[in-house]
Amino acid sequence: MTQHHDTAEVSRVIATLTREVADFPEPGIQFKDLTPLLADARGLRVVTDALADIASGADLVAGLDARGFLLGAAVATRLGTGVLAVRKGGKLPPPVHGATYQLEYGTATLEIPAEGIDIAGRNVVIIDDVLATGGTLAAAARLLGDCGANVTGAGVVLELEALRGREAVAPLGVRSLHII
């Protein structure tokens, strides 16, 4: 199943199809909008194939709220595995397992169902769109691990290197398709 993709070409496709939005969501921020990438058939295929390489060997893909749902489902379909949506707090009916993490101002929670799915002992790869500060990815890895999953790694489309998210998720191995 594993193919070897031209990483420079994958990175070029991502860079070409990423829209930059100045001063969003607040002044001074250069928002990276991946919507054009995901809406482009070739862009979605290139990203899905490359993330599927990263997730090869997993028997469950965990997609993070919200664009990670799209990517995770595409990767799981390519690999022939299931997908688990790791939701923001308050979106799932009880009972749930949750993990709280720090935001710049306050806290947030991620949740997964506590019933109906058994992730104990399963090899899980986490998929998301962007690695920024690493808080969400670290919380997801902690949550899944606390529920008995073997989190083998993570794959993201875009890494904002200056925000040092990779350090926040260490020792979890993260592979990024495009780093800026």
Curated annotation (Swiss-Prot):
Where's it found, cell-wise?
Cytoplasm
The pathway entry for this protein reads as: Purine metabolism; AMP biosynthesis via salvage pathway; AMP from adenine: step 1/1
Q: Which reaction does it catalyse?
A: AMP + diphosphate = 5-phospho-alpha-D-ribose 1-diphosphate + adenine
Q: Coiled-coil intervals in this record?
A: none
Per UniProt, what is one GO molecular function of this protein? adenine binding
GO CC term, one of those recorded: cytoplasm
User: Which BP terms in the Gene Ontology apply to this protein?
Assistant: adenine salvage; AMP salvage; purine ribonucleoside salvage
Q: Which InterPro entries match?
A: Ade_phspho_trans, PRibTrfase_dom, PRTase-like, UPRTase/APRTase
Any one Pfam family match given in the protein's UniProt record, by short name: Pribosyltran
Give the E.C. number(s): 2.4.2.7
Q: Which domain of life is it from?
A: Bacteria
What keywords are assigned to this protein? Cytoplasm, Glycosyltransferase, Purine salvage, Transferase
Report the transmembrane regions from the record: none
Oligomeric and partner information:
Homodimer.
Q: What does this protein do?
A: Catalyzes a salvage reaction resulting in the formation of AMP, that is energically less costly than de novo synthesis.
Which family does the record assign? Belongs to the purine/pyrimidine phosphoribosyltransferase family.
| Entry protein name | Adenine phosphoribosyltransferase
What is the organism of origin for this protein?
A: Mycolicibacterium smegmatis (strain ATCC 700084 / mc(2)155) (Mycobacterium smegmatis)
Query: Which gene does this sequence derive from?
Result: apt
